[in-house]
């Protein structure tokens, strides 16, 4: 995968999290991920604390979505929570690197009114020979 293809993958990946049209979002998910692709989320500390306080053993758990339906639900929920109201948008940082079948980059969540960075994270994608995501590791900060 060339540098331009890596940048395109990153742009499309970050873009799908802000896609308003549900049909287009699903189509893009099916284009980006392999059919049995996985998304792993390292939950923020606040999430772990709340879950632990409710008696769940999530202190060190990783959340996982597998396959198009679960991936679509995960992306849609993030869209609804952060983007749909118009308050925030996601954007990639210009630091994507590829090493064999792994792409690493950072992303930011910015306030649409001010451009202020409100959050972000590190993303590590493993892709197959066709450039489709087989494993997606998200580390929000």
Task: Give the residues covered by each predicted segment.
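C-terminal and inter-domain tail/linker signature
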Residues: 1-141
């Amino acid at each position: 995968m060339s540098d331009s293809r890596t940048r395109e993958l990153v742009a499309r990946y970050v873009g799908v999290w802000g896609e308003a049209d549900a049909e287009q979002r699903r189509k893009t998910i099916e284009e980006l991920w392999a059919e049995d692709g996985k998304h792993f989320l390292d939950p923020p500390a606040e999430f772990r604390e709340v879950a632990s306080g409710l008696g769940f053993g999530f202190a060190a758990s990783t959340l996982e979505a597998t396959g198009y339906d679960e991936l679509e639900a995960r992306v849609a929920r993030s869209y609804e929570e952060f983007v749909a109201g118009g308050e925030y948008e996601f954007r990639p940082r210009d630091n994507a690197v590829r090493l064999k079948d792994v792409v690493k980059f950072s992303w930011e969540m910015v306030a649409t009114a001010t451009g202020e960075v409100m959050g972000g994270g590190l993303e590590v994608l493993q892709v197959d020979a066709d450039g489709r995501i087989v494993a997606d590791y998200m580390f929000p900060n």
